[in-house]
Amino acid sequence: EALPGYAPQSPMVFTGIFPTEGEDYPELRDALEKLQLNDAALVFEPESSAALGFGFRCGFLGLLHMDTVQERLEREYGLGLIATAPSVSYEVLLKTGDSITIDNPSKLPENHAYDEIREPWVNITIVSPARYIGAIMELVTSKRGEYRKMEYLESIATQDSDTETAANRDARVMLEYDIPLSEILVDFHDKLKSGTQGYASMDYSIIDNRAADLVKLDVLVNHEPVDALSMITHRGEAASYGRA
């Protein structure tokens, strides 16, 4: 009997994983089942794609969990893999009054069938030397982040001298933002490290779901949509993603 107060952990990040060789599908299934024996947070279900064949839709606790599982599948089981762009789960409010949760862009109903899409938001904490505050703020703002607070973790000098100014620039500062989870899935961490010369660290926690102006972006190859390349994105970013 389970102890009271505990609940299974819910996956927050989802991606499709397909073998590069179609005949490796059974081996991929067996490998995922073996990993799941020691990793109850890993969830997966069969998925088929017209472009990529048979694979699995996998759910992870976060980005590190996703990267670790993919790396183990390749290293420990010798599998060649194709992974689709990571996504989050969205809450879709239907015109019937019901709501559904989707973790695959291909499952989003037609525009006329729903009133609203809600996406998960996280509270993100970034710790960095103070000299990189400007670069961090610019990055988070470009990702639809909402500023919450900033706090110096070390006392700063108040007298005006070259030595003390340098010390102030190296003092650690903590910045706190609310930001959509989808905005930190792909390149956020790399850009954060690049903009701070590797000095910044980050942590985040889920806070709630919020309504957003989201649309489904289909990618066409030879004038035909490729389901594996579809994504849900903010309307204002759809054009730039489509051209990328």
Q: Could you describe each region identified by the protein language model?
A:
Residues 1-244:
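Structural and coupling elements of P-loop NTPases
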